[in-house]
Amino acid sequence: MENISFGKEQLAKGIYGGTLPPTRKLAQIAVADIGAVAIRVLEEAGRFTGKRYDLAGDELTGNDVTAILSRVTGRPFTYYQIPLDVIRQRMGEDGAKMYEWFDRVGFMVDRPALRREFPDVAFHDFESWAKTLDWKALLQSGGSK
């Protein structure tokens, strides 16, 4: 979820940019949730040896994110789909292939199963996570460049 701060300049203008079509869902996770899972795995290493988990606290479209940003900040946001050519220039061919795969196949997580496996981790949904941020400072810092 913290990846949203990479677009501070655009957010300051009321634009949320993403690489997927505005109605394509993508799983997202907060850094705090990754840390909480890592602690649990380290504390109970024997139980988790050889296991692999996809992590997500929420699954949202670009339109979902803009609606949440508008509610949380009290400012209107619009979605802008970043062209793959721009992604390719900024992130290289591997980055472009990753987003092509997200669009073609999707990245979704069995969140109910994840919560059963890690019941003590309070996975954040995007809106509750967004409410913890200082949007005034974040949006001002993005507009100052």
Residue spans for each PLM region:
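Conserved residues in the N-terminal Rossmann fold of short-chain dehydrogenase/reductase
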Residues: 81
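Oxidoreductase cofactor-interface core, primarily capturing Rossmann-like NAD(P)-dependent enzymes
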Residues: 1-78, 86-91, 134
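A hydrophobic C-terminal alpha-helical subdomain
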Residues: 84-145
